[in-house]
């Protein structure tokens, strides 16, 4: 007779089976949990090497010292503290075998307080926006991850530890609310919020039907859901006139601090997040979104409209002045912040008299009629400068006062042309120079090099010489007849490099290690009546060429076409090494120190290299310019690239340059890097060279000679800048570059 099991027995068996499965799951989770996911109840041993790599031992060394399987125990932690010599400083509660995540990271924080004296490990709450293999995109940037990628889920928050650009540990999950600061809200349609953040558009459900469009806001998340939206609707509209890392100066308003999480959005031709490079001083009407007295976002509602350039006026190559006085023949309106004062015509305006105001604000000086110029004066009011069109701005810094001339671009170019070339050069050469000056100025306005001082450029050879010579009818006409014309290559306005005199051939983009795609218009060309088949990259061929005057070259009658000098570094070792170190500070990638002439091992300093033993040309390109120069010393060697570095360094050894016309001139820098160097056997070096300037782009004297050959300005420009075209500047210029998407 078959026995029938009772229902009670079946239930008992099912219960026992379920309990067994549960126990197995717990055991598996305890030993294999890292493969299945993040746990608050334990820390996995193989998390520890990444967390402790900032200490005396590397990540690999920690992996050897600690078992890497299973979960972390209090015994493990005790061993870690002993290895770190912290056991007597950090007490342990060893009541349980395994240590949970919160307890371990409390101990880890204490370890950091003792050992991480440089604060290299940072603690941060992140919100995961995107996960790709071993990389997380978060509200604050992109980080590599060392733990299991399965731990991280999109739109969840994590308390993490960061070392450089890596997440090295996870202390908690969904414990803190995290906000996307200064996101751009596009729309809220039927509870679906569309917003832009870090270059990526997101669409998420939101528990509200309120209007949320075209506004900047903080979006707070809690456990994967939006739980709060804080709109930021206070704005200031105006022009940006100076910018530092911490503040922006708005014309007619003053300085405003910058939120660390500030975003920039272009809202014309679609909505996109753009980089800081999109901002141009003076020439953009900008909407600044402000919250808690900080700029938290910038809205670019239209492209830049090029009107004015801001020129820092130097005082004998010094940007700072102990004091300065200006005057105009008409009443002057003086602006600072939102305040306006009118001064009588002829009033001497001295910066030190406004020191109290300048301590917190710039001061803008505007002629009442909008056209009368300003002049610098001495202490007695005597005029000591040419006339300056436009307005003036005064600022005060710990080093002294600065003066910025805000002037329309055409007036600026009119001030550049006579300062760069004589009006006798011929109209077509002057017009070519005007197009170059205008194009070059635009590029510098994009670069904003002097933005911290409220300027785009200065008035020296650092950029373009400005207002150092009086304008003439010819130079003014050259600017007027080319008004608004700039050179473009592949649709972009180009940087129109120019210089004084060629040696018969111009340089190309390779001389400065420039990108061929962007600077392909800088091709080396012969500046002579016909091509010459000589290979100028060959040392012997170059020496043969530079040793003679090539009469077929347009500039062969000019004194800088050929020159010679002697390099003598005896007694100048300290000066030479100091100059090398200075140039490396300015351009570190172009100069390299080696322990010896074999150049197999680098070193960080050249200060103990001793005296110079030899100079060698390592590489020369087809235009003839030296690409790499090697200087061998008693205790090391130096590799030098870039023509200006070579000219400055070798310039330490010269006194006079002997020119083609028989004259001699004192110089402290070589006229060009189109040179041949020959050791003389007595420790000195004979140098044969040609040309004056960097040699890249347009030769100004070459342009004059081409003008004399009947070339018009368009043909001159196409001669020196290959595959370019004239375009119109005074139309809206799109300066924006879209930020990389998440």
Where do the model's predicted regions map?
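The conserved cystathionine-beta-synthase
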Residues: 81-84, 101
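Residues within well-ordered alpha-helices
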Residues: 77-80, 702
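Conserved, single-site charged/polar hotspot
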Residues: 2-42, 46-47, 51, 56-67, ...
């Amino acid at each position: 007779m078959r026995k029938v099991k009772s229902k009670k027995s079946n239930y008992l068996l099912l219960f026992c089976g379920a309990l067994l499965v549960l126990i197995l799951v717990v055991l598996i989770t305890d030993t294999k949990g890292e493969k299945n996911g993040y746990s608050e109840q334990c820390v996995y041993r193989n998390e520890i090497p990444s967390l402790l790599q900032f200490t005396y031992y590397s990540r690999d060394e920690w992996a050897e010292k600690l078992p890497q399987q299973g979960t972390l125990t209090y015994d493990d932690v005790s061993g870690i503290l002993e290895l770190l010599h912290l056991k007597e400083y950090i007490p342990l509660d060893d009541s349980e075998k395994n240590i949970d995540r919160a307890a371990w990271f409390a101990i880890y924080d204490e370890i950091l307080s003792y050992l991480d004296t440089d604060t290299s490990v940072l603690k941060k709450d992140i919100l995961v926006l995107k996960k790709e293999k071993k990389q997380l995109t978060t509200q604050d940037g992109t980080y590599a991850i060392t733990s299991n990628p399965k731990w991280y889920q999109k739109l969840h928050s994590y308390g993490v530890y960061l070392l450089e650009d890596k997440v090295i540990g996870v202390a908690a999950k969904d414990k803190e609310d995290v906000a996307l600061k200064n996101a751009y809200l596009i729309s809220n349609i039927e509870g679906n919020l569309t917003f832009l953040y870090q270059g990526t558009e997101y669409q998420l459900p939101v528990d509200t039907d309120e209007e949320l469009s075209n506004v900047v806001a903080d979006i707070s998340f809690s456990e994967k859901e939006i739980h709060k939206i804080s709109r930021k609707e206070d704005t200031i509209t105006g022009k940006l006139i100076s910018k530092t890392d911490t503040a922006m100066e708005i014309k007619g308003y003053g300085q405003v601090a910058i939120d660390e999480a500030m975003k920039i959005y272009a809202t014309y031709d679609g909505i996109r997040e753009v980089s800081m490079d999109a901002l141009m001083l003076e020439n953009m009407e900008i909407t600044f979104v402000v919250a808690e007295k900080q700029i938290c976002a910038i809205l670019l509602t239209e492209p830049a409209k090029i009107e004015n350039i801001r020129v820092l006026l130097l005082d004998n190559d010094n940007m700072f002045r102990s004091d300065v006085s200006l005057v105009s023949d008409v009443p002057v309106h003086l602006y600072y912040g939102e305040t306006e004062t009118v001064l009588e015509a002829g009033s001497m305006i001295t910066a030190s008299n406004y020191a109290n105001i300048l301590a917190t604000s710039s001061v803008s000086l505007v002629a009442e009629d909008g056209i009368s110029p300003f002049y610098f004066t001495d202490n007695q009011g005597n005029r000591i400068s040419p006339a300056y069109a436009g307005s003036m701005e005064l600022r005060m810094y710990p080093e002294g006062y600065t003066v910025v001339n805000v002037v329309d671009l055409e007036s600026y170019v009119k001030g550049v042309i006579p300062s760069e070339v004589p009006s006798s050069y011929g109209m077509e050469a002057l017009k070519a120079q005007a197009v170059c000056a205008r194009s070059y100025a635009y590029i510098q306005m994009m670069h904003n090099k002097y933005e911290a001082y409220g300027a785009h450029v200065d008035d020296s050879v650092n950029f373009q010489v400005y207002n150092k010579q009086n304008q003439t009818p010819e130079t003014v006409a050259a600017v007027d007849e080319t008004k608004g014309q700039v050179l473009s290559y592949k649709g972009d306005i180009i940087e129109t490099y120019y210089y004084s005199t060629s040696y018969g051939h111009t340089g190309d983009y390779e001389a400065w290690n420039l990108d061929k795609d962007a600077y392909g218009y800088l091709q080396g060309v012969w500046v002579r009546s016909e091509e010459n088949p000589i290979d100028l990259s060959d040392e012997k061929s170059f020496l043969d060429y530079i040793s003679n005057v090539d009469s077929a070259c347009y500039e062969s009658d000019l004194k800088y076409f050929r020159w010679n000098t002697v390099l003598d570094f005896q007694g100048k070792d300290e000066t030479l090494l100091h100059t090398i170190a200075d140039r490396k500070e300015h351009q570190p990638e172009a100069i390299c120190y080696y322990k010896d002439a074999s150049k197999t091992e680098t070193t960080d300093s050249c200060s103990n290299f001793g005296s110079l033993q030899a100079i060698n040309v390592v590489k020369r390109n087809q235009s003839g310019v030296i690409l790499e120069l090697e200087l061998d010393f008693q205790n090391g060697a130096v590799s030098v690239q870039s023509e200006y570095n070579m000219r400055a360094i070798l310039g330490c050894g010269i006194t006079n340059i002997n020119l083609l016309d028989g004259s001699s001139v004192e110089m402290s820098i070589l006229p060009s890097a189109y040179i041949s160097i020959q050791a003389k056997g007595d420790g000195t070096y004979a140098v044969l060279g040609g040309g004056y300037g960097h040699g890249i782009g347009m030769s100004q004297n070459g342009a004059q000679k081409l003008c004399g050959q009947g070339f018009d300005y368009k043909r001159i420009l196409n001669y020196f800048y290959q595959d370019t075209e004239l375009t119109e500047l005074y139309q809206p210029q799109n300066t924006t570059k879209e930020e990389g998407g998440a």
